[in-house]
Amino acid sequence: MAKNSNPSAFDRDFGYLMPFLDRVAAAASDLEDASARAELTRLMVEEKARWQRIQELLGGAGGRGAAAPTPAREAPAEAPRLARGSADELHEAAPFATGLTVGSLRGSR
């Protein structure tokens, strides 16, 4: 994978993204459902932290994780679930293959 030779290439995008995330987080306080308000607040804190870390990595910061895993010699008996930053069950991998859309999603006129 090529190294990003211009770390400021995404500055404009982050300039739009971070205020957007702040607006969504602020909108959480207007939710009537207390559990929804708490969940959205938590999700936005996690999301903003992820994007700040992405920005640091694009700027040249070193990685914190372990080295890339070596490929498995044998296929696992069951397909693993997708990794998530939080342990919610809303975004697990589908246990079956999904169809792909080919062609335009717009109807012909």
UniProtKB/Swiss-Prot annotation:
<feature type="region of interest" description="Probable targeting peptide">
    <location>
        <begin position="100"/>
        <end position="106"/>
    </location>
</feature>
<dbReference type="GO" id="GO:0006879">
    <property type="term" value="P:intracellular iron ion homeostasis"/>
</dbReference>
<feature type="binding site">
    <location>
        <position position="47"/>
    </location>
    <ligand>
        <name>Fe cation 1</name>
    </ligand>
</feature>
<feature type="binding site">
    <location>
        <position position="47"/>
    </location>
    <ligand>
        <name>Fe cation 2</name>
    </ligand>
</feature>
<keyword id="KW-0479">Metal-binding</keyword>
<feature type="region of interest" description="Disordered">
    <location>
        <begin position="61"/>
        <end position="94"/>
    </location>
</feature>
<dbReference type="GO" id="GO:0046872">
    <property type="term" value="F:metal ion binding"/>
</dbReference>
<comment type="function">
    <text>Cargo protein of a type 1 encapsulin nanocompartment. May help nucleate Fe atoms in the interior of the encapsulin nanocompartment. Present in about 47 copies/encapsulin nanocompartment.</text>
</comment>
<keyword id="KW-0408">Iron</keyword>
<protein>
    <recommendedName>
        <fullName>Encapsulin nanocompartment cargo protein EncD</fullName>
    </recommendedName>
</protein>
<feature type="compositionally biased region" description="Low complexity">
    <location>
        <begin position="66"/>
        <end position="85"/>
    </location>
</feature>
<dbReference type="GO" id="GO:0140737">
    <property type="term" value="C:encapsulin nanocompartment"/>
</dbReference>
<keyword id="KW-0409">Iron storage</keyword>
<keyword id="KW-1284">Encapsulin nanocompartment</keyword>
